[in-house]
Design a protein with these regions (language model features):
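Short intrinsically disordered terminal tails
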Residues: 1, 78-84
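Amphipathic alpha-helical segments
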Residues: 1-15
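Residue-level detector of alpha-helical secondary structure
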Residues: 70-73, 77
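Short amphipathic alpha-helical segments that mediate assembly, nucleic-acid/protein binding
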Residues: 2, 66-69
Length: 84
């Protein structure tokens, strides 16, 4: 998946050490409390081929296809029950 596709998913860019002049960053999306999607650091990406992981799972749950992640996020978003 490309970096542009990561942005289209609504993931936000997080700089790692911007105050130290480091250009490293990753993307994150907190869908709900306890369910976070995260990418690898840009320095680990080869050929603009990004992955999206479900944060803090064992074993790792990883997606490489934009349409799959987009579909999953759409389904999960529709299933969110508001407490208000």
């Amino acid at each position: 998946m490309t970096e542009r596709e990561i942005e289209l998913l609504g993931m936000r860019k997080e700089n790692i050490n911007e105050y130290e002049g480091d250009d490293s960053y990753y993307y994150v999306l907190d869908l709900v409390n306890g369910l976070t999607f995260i990418t690898e650091c840009n320095t680990q990406v080869e050929n603009n081929d990004w992955n999206v992981d479900v944060f803090n799972t064992e074993p790792t749950i990883r997606f490489t296809n934009f349409a799959e992640v987009q579909g999953l996020l759409n389904k999960l978003s529709k299933a969110i029950v508001s407490n208000g």
